[in-house]
Amino acid sequence: MTKITNDLFLKAARKEQVDRIPVWYMRQAGRSQPEYRKLKEKYSLFEITHQPEICAYVTKLPVDQYGVDAAILYKDIMTPLPGMGVDVEIKSGIGPVIHNPIRSFQDVEKLTIFKPEIEVPYVLDTIKLLADDMLDVPLIGFAGAPFTLASYMIEGGPSKNYHQTKSFMYREPEVWAILMEKLGRMTANYLIAQINAGASAVQLFDSWVGALSRADYAEYIRPVIEMIVREVKAVHPTTPIIMQAVGASHLLEEWETMPLDVVGVDWRETITSARKKVPTKAIQGNLDPSTLLAPEKCLKEANRILQEGVLEPGYIFNLGHGVFPEVPPEMLKQLTNYIHERSEILLKKDDIK
């Protein structure tokens, strides 16, 4: 296995002292990069993600180009679902489309047991290739969290309000619990397999869980998240687990009482206020990705965020959501350099101004 020579990200995830703030970006690999767009002229998304050498190349690009302190596996949160019998298609301009949406107990009952080594060997081969031969920074594996996956499976695709998902959850609580159990087992097994293959950390993407109230989260979602984290930690107790959601600041206190290591926040929550709600966790975030299209504003906001981030150990600079396709790669390189240089200065100062 290639030795990790830059462990800033892992130190921050463990709330240890660092000499500069680590930085990486959600969706840092892929559609905003000219090299990726050139690949897409020759290969489909399916081909890119199913060929370990190509997928590893795409995953590593931001490390080489931007100098980020962690790589995140280039995959989709839908990747494991076909291994459970879900007929999913990623449509350009739309996103995931489910051709056999869940409508009943019978549909949930049909979901099969997911075995990562059998269903997604190409994912594990990509991780092994990166960890063994290509990276000197930590590799982050990831999975979609059960609520977000269920919302696609029930709605049949992207949704703005999740009415069908919520009504199913409210009307059929017993069936919902079975669905969560199945998705939870799949997610835990998937994350464990990624760590076994060489991932240094894992992130749970619960993109749409902010649509739920805290009371509903506690009743319908918290048990399965606790189960996932518990099962992963039982096998890999020292591997950092990150929880990432959008518009979910009202759920921070729920995550504080789980054995998570890092909590991601978006631009709706300041780093300072987030720390008060999750004092035992490292914080990741929280630049609005829209500012990447306004360079002067971007660096100004980054400086403001850093002023708060450096006040305590356990801070990782990131966005509150993913990189847009329109973002120039040069902007991400400039921002990465700025975060490294500015945070190093701030961390050396006794008085932060």
Swiss-Prot record:
GO terms for biological process: heme biosynthetic process; protoporphyrinogen IX biosynthetic process. It catalyses: uroporphyrinogen III + 4 H(+) = coproporphyrinogen III + 4 CO2. Substrate binds at R27, Q28, A29, G30, R31, F46, D76, Y152, S207, H321. Pathway: Porphyrin-containing compound metabolism; protoporphyrin-IX biosynthesis; coproporphyrinogen-III from 5-aminolevulinate: step 4/4. InterPro entries: UROD/MetE-like_sf, Uroporphyrinogen_deCO2ase_HemE, Uroporphyrinogen_deCOase. The record marks D76 as: Transition state stabilizer. Keywords: Cytoplasm, Decarboxylase, Lyase, Porphyrin biosynthesis. GO terms for molecular function: uroporphyrinogen decarboxylase activity. It holds the Pfam family URO-D. Its EC number is 4.1.1.37. It is found in: Cytoplasm. GO terms for cellular component: cytosol. Catalyzes the decarboxylation of four acetate groups of uroporphyrinogen-III to yield coproporphyrinogen-III. Belongs to the uroporphyrinogen decarboxylase family. HAMAP family: URO_D. Homodimer. This is Uroporphyrinogen decarboxylase. It comes from Listeria monocytogenes serovar 1/2a (strain ATCC BAA-679 / EGD-e). The gene is hemE.
